[in-house]
A protein has these predicted regions:
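Outer membrane beta-barrel strand-and-loop segments of large Gram-negative receptors
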Residues: 290, 421-423, 467-475, 577, ...
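Signature of Gram-negative outer-membrane beta-barrel scaffolds
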Residues: 437-545, 724
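Conserved C-terminal beta-signal and adjacent last beta-strands/turns
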Residues: 694-716, 727-838
C-alpha cells in the first residue's frame, strides 16, 4: 500500500474498526522508500453497544442516569471463575461489610433483580454467591419505591436500595450451567452448581452448594445472639454449610409471577475473647471473657409475587411468604471482672439452647384507575402470624471474692411465643389543575405479641428439674400495639423538577400486661402522638445531574424482650430486666443526594447527606454492683440520640485511559445516650459522642494483558464519654495491591496483598499489624474454554486475624475471633452455555 510520507517525520499507522481496539504502530523516517511487512495484525473486541451507537474505547466505570447509577461490568476485571460478589466489591461506593451485607454508597442493598425481576426475593446473598460475573452486562443501583407507590404514585416512604443486573443477550438463548468442585488441605472442600435459563419473559435458576470454607450460598435467617452477632468478617469461625434453592419467574399477557424457595443448613464453630470497659465515674470496671460456641441452623424460606392486570384500569398484587428456622447452640465460657486492678469475680458456664420458629405473611393490594387521568384508589392489606418455641439449659458457677461466696445456677428455661399483626391502608389520588395531584393515605396497624417464660430450677435430691416453675423468674406477657397514620400531600411533576410535600399525623398506643397463673402483675398503657412533615423533592439539572431531598418520620414499637418485666438470670454477672413502661419510638430522617456524570471525562460523582433523630429512643440503663462486679441492664426511653453522616463517591478515567481511579469518603458524627449508676445511686446520664471518618482510594493501570491496582484506606474513630471523661481513638490503615496478569499458553494469574495496621485497640490501646496475601493461578481448557482449572491459596503468610470494637453509651467492647486461616484449594469449574436448547 503506497504511503505519502511526511518529510523528516515519523509515520504513525493506526488501524481501527467499530467495536474493536485501535492498532497503533510508530514507523521511523529511516524506513521511507522501503517495503515493510507488519505480519498479521489482531484487533481485539473493545466495544460497548448503546442503542444504535457503538462507542469504541474503555467503558465508563459508572454513569448517572437520573436517579440511577449504572455500572458497566466490562469496565471491571475479575479473575476467571469469579462470582458477582467479586465484581461488586470493585464498584465505586460498593462494599461487602462484615455481616456479608452489600452496601452501595453506604446504603444496604435489600434486593437484587435480574433484568428487572426479583431474584430470590429479599436475599441478595443468593445472587452475590451464585451468579457468575461473565453473564452480567450492566448493574443498575437505585432506590425503588414500594409496590403501592409504584402503582399509585403516592410516596409511602418504603423505598429500598436495589441492584438490578442486566444479563448479556447471548446468555438468554438457552441453558447455562456453572459447576464447581474443589478440594484442599485441612480437609477443605467446595461443591456448587448454578443452572440458569434466562429469557425475555421467564427465568429459572436452580442453585446447590456444599462446602466447609465459610461460603454460605444463602443468608442465614437467624443468627442467634452469640458473640458473633456484630460487624465482623464472614470468615470468622469455622462454618460448614449446605444449601439448595430454586427461583422461577414468568410473564404472561396479564399476569406476572415471581417465586422462589430456598433451604440453608449451617454448622458453625466459633471461639472469641472479649474485653469490656464499663463507663463508671468512680471505679474502673473491666471484665474479660472467653467463649466457645457451636451452632447449627436450618432455614427454609418460600416467597411468591403475583401481579394480575385484571383489566386496563384494575391491578391486583399478592405476596405470600413463609419462613421456618430451627437451631441449636452449645456454649461454654469463662469470665473474670476487676475493679481498680482488684479481682471481683470469676465465672464458668455452659449452656444448651434449642429453638424453632415460623413466620407466615400475606400482602394483598388492589389498585383501580378512574376515567379522569391521575385519579386512582388503592387498598392494601398486610397480615402476618408467627410462633416460636425455645428450650434452654443453663449451668454456671460464679465466685465472688469480696465476700467469698459462690452462686450456682442450674436451670431450664422454656420460652414460648406467638403473635399476629395486620395493617390496612387506603390511598386516594385526585388530580388538580396544572398537573398537581392531591393525595390522601390512611393506615391502621394492629399487632399482638404473647410471650411465656417459665424457669425450672435443679433439685439436687431429685437429680432433676423441679416440676414447679420459679415464680420470681417466670411470667406470661402480652403486648398490643396500634397506630393510625393520616397523611395528606400534594405532588407535581415538571420537566426540571418534581416534588411530593405533605404532613403525617400518627397516634401510637401500646398496651401491655404481665400475669402469672391468670393473676395480673403489671398492666401499662402508653399513648404517643407524633407529627411530622414529609418531603420528596427532585431537581434535574440535566439528564446526567440531579439533586434529591427526602424528609420523613416513622414510628416503631419496643421489642417483647425489652418490654417483658422478668429478670434473665442466665448470667448473674449480666442480668437483664425488661421494662413494660417503655413508649414507642419515632424516628425522623432527612436525606440529600446529588448525582452527576461527566460524559467527556467519564467521571461519576455521588454525594449523600443523612441526618437522623430518634424521639423516645429505646436505650439502656446499666446498674453496676461494686461488691460483686455484676451489671443489671434495663431498657429505658431517652431523647437525644441522633446521627449525621456524609459520603462522597468519585470514579473515572485519567487522560491516559489506561489509568482509572476510584475514591470513597465517609464522615459520621453520632450522639448516643444511656444511663449508668453504681450500686443504688441516682442514675447518671451517659453520653458518647462518636466521630467516624473513612477515606478509600484506588488507582488502576490496565492494558490488554495486565491489570495492576494500588489501594489504600484509612478509618478513624474518636469517642468521648462524659461519665468517665475519657476519649478513645483508633486508626485502621490498609495498604494493598491487586495484580491480574494473562500469561502465555492461556494461563491467568491473580494476586492480592493487603497490609493492615490497627492502633488504639484493647485495654492497653495497643496496635496490631498483619499482612494478608492471596493468590490464584488458572487455565481454561476445551475448544470454547468451558473448563477452568484453578489453584487458589488463601492467607499464604498465615496472618489473618479478626478483631471488632463496639462502643455503646455505657461501655466499650473489644472482641477477637477465630478465623479460617491458611489453606489452599484446587477447583475445577465447568461452564456450559447450551445455546438454543429448550
Amino acid at each position: 500500500m503506497p504511503v505519502v510520507w511526511p518529510k523528516d517525520k515519523k509515520l504513525l499507522l493506526e488501524i481501527s474498526f467499530i467495536g474493536y481496539t485501535t492498532f497503533s504502530k510508530s514507523i521511523p523516517s529511516s524506513f521511507r522508500g522501503t517495503s515493510q511487512n507488519l505480519g498479521d495484525i489482531a484487533l481485539f473486541s473493545d466495544g460497548i453497544l448503546l442503542g444504535e451507537t457503538v462507542v469504541v474505547g474503555k467503558a465508563p466505570l459508572a454513569v448517572t442516569e437520573q436517579d440511577t447509577t449504572v455500572f458497566n461490568a466490562s469496565a471491571y476485571r475479575t479473575p476467571e471463575g469469579s462470582m458477582l460478589e467479586d465484581l461488586v466489591k470493585q464498584l465505586p461506593g460498593g462494599e461487602i461489610d462484615g455481616d456479608g451485607k452489600l452496601l452501595i454508597h453506604g446504603k444496604e442493598v435489600k434486593k437484587i433483580l435480574v433484568d428487572g425481576k426479583e431474584f430470590f426475593a429479599d436475599d441478595p446473598k443468593a445472587a452475590l454467591k451464585n451468579l457468575p460475573v461473565e453473564m452480567v452486562e450492566k448493574l443498575r443501583a437505585y432506590e425503588r419505591k414500594s409496590d403501592l407507590a409504584r402503582l399509585t404514585g403516592i410516596d409511602d416512604g418504603d423505598e429500598e436500595m436495589i441492584l438490578d443486573l442486566g444479563v448479556k443477550k447471548d446468555m438468554k438463548k438457552g441453558w447455562m450451567d456453572n459447576f464447581m468442585a474443589g478440594t484442599g488441605n485441612k480437609g477443605r472442600y467446595e461443591l456448587a452448581n448454578t443452572l440458569n435459563r434466562f429469557r425475555d419473559n421467564s427465568q429459572l435458576t436452580i442453585i446447590g452448594n456444599l462446602n466447609n470454607t465459610n461460603n454460605q450460598g444463602f443468608s442465614e435467617l437467624q443468627r442467634e445472639s452469640s458473640a458473633a452477632s456484630g460487624n465482623i468478617l464472614n470468615r470468622v469461625g469455622l462454618v460448614t454449610s449446605h444449601s439448595l434453592g430454586m427461583n422461577f419467574t414468568h410473564d404472561w399477557d396479564r399476569v406476572k409471577l415471581r417465586s422462589n424457595v430456598q433451604y440453608t443448613g449451617t454448622d458453625r464453630s466459633e471461639d472469641n475473647s472479649t474485653t469490656v470497659d464499663n463507663f463508671l465515674k468512680q471505679d474502673k470496671s473491666i471484665s474479660h471473657s472467653t467463649n466457645s460456641n457451636h451452632m447449627k441452623n436450618h432455614n427454609l424460606t418460600a416467597n411468591a409475587y403475583l401481579e394480575w392486570k385484571i383489566d386496563s384500569v384494575t391491578n391486583l398484587v399478592f405476596r405470600p411468604q413463609y419462613r421456618y428456622v430451627a437451631s441449636d447452640r452449645r456454649n461454654s465460657g469463662y469470665q473474670q471482672s476487676w475493679s481498680d486492678e482488684t479481682l471481683l469475680n470469676e465465672r464458668t458456664a455452659s449452656n444448651l439452647y434449642d429453638n424453632s420458629q415460623y413466620n407466615l405473611t400475606f400482602m394483598l393490594q388492589v389498585n383501580r384507575k378512574f376515567s379522569r387521568k391521575g385519579r386512582n384508589l388503592a387498598l392494601k392489606v398486610d397480615y402476618g402470624t408467627n410462633t416460636s418455641s425455645a428450650d434452654r439449659k443453663n449451668f454456671s458457677t460464679t465466685h465472688y471474692f469480696k465476700n467469698d461466696t459462690e452462686k450456682v445456677v442450674n436451670q431450664r428455661v422454656d420460652d414460648e411465643g406467638d403473635g399476629y399483626n395486620y395493617r390496612l391502608q387506603l390511598v386516594y389520588v385526585e388530580p388538580l389543575p396544572n398537573r398537581y395531584f392531591l393525595q390522601f393515605r390512611y393506615s391502621y396497624q394492629y399487632r399482638v405479641t404473647n410471650s411465656d417464660r417459665f424457669v425450672y430450677n435443679w433439685d439436687e435430691a431429685m437429680e432433676d428439674f423441679v416440676a414447679d416453675y420459679d415464680s420470681l423468674a417466670s411470667n406470661s406477657f402480652e403486648s398490643q400495639y396500634s397506630t393510625h397514620l393520616f397523611n395528606m400531600a400534594v405532588r407535581t411533576s415538571r420537566k426540571k423538577y418534581n416534588y411530593n410535600i405533605g404532613v403525617d399525623l400518627e397516634p401510637q398506643k401500646l398496651d401491655s400486661r404481665s400475669f402469672l397463673d391468670d393473676v395480673s402483675k403489671h398492666q401499662m398503657s402508653k399513648t404517643v402522638l407524633n407529627f411530622s412533615p414529609t418531603l420528596n423533592f427532585r431537581y434535574k439539572f440535566s439528564k446526567r445531574t440531579q439533586l434529591q431531598a427526602i424528609y420523613r418520620g416513622k414510628g416503631r414499637q419496643p421489642s417483647v424482650r425489652d418490654l417483658q418485666p422478668v429478670a434473665d438470670m442466665t448470667n448473674p454477672l449480666n442480668i437483664r430486666i425488661g421494662n413494660p413502661s417503655l413508649k414507642p419510638s419515632y424516628t425522623n430522617t432527612f436525606t440529600l443526594n446529588y448525582n452527576s456524570y461527566n460524559v467527556k471525562h467519564q467521571r461519576n460523582m455521588v454525594v449523600s447527606l443523612f441526618v437522623e433523630n430518634v424521639l423516645n429512643s429505646v436505650t439502656n440503663q446499666v446498674t453496676y454492683d461494686s461488691e460483686t462486679g455484676g451489671r443489671t441492664t434495663m431498657p429505658v426511653n431517652l431523647n437525644g440520640n441522633w446521627r449525621a453522616s456524609g459520603a462522597l463517591s468519585l470514579s473515572g478515567l485519567f487522560k491516559n485511559r489506561n489509568w482509572l481511579f476510584r475514591t470513597y469518603s465517609y464522615l459520621q458524627y453520632r450522639n448516643q445516650n444511656g444511663y449508668t449508676t453504681q450500686n443504688k445511686e441516682e442514675p447518671m446520664k451517659s453520653s458518647v459522642k462518636h466521630l467516624t471518618a473513612r477515606e478509600r482510594l484506588q488507582f488502576t493501570f490496565r492494558t490488554r494483558q495486565l491489570e495492576l491496582s494500588a489501594r489504600g484506606e484509612v478509618l478513624y474513630n474518636n469517642s468521648y464519654n462524659n461519665v468517665k471523661d475519657m476519649r478513645t481513638e483508633t486508626f485502621d490503615y490498609q495498604l494493598g495491591g491487586d495484580l491480574q496478569y494473562y500469561l502465555p499458553w492461556g494461563f491467568e494469574c491473580s494476586s492480592d496483598l493487603t497490609y493492615f495496621l490497627r492502633t488504639g485497640y484493647g485495654y492497653d490501646s495497643s496496635g496490631r499489624k498483619n499482612l494478608i496475601w492471596n493468590c490464584q493461578l488458572s487455565k481454561a481448557f476445551l475448544k470454547k474454554k468451558q473448563l477452568l482449572l484453578r489453584f487458589k491459596f488463601y492467607d499464604i503468610l498465615r496472618q489473618e486475624i479478626s478483631m471488632v470494637r463496639t462502643i455503646s453509651a455505657t461501655a466499650i467492647r473489644d472482641a477477637d475471633y477465630n478465623v479460617l486461616g491458611r489453606y489452599f484449594m484446587v477447583h475445577a469449574i465447568l461452564r456450559l452455555n447450551m445455546m438454543g436448547k429448550k
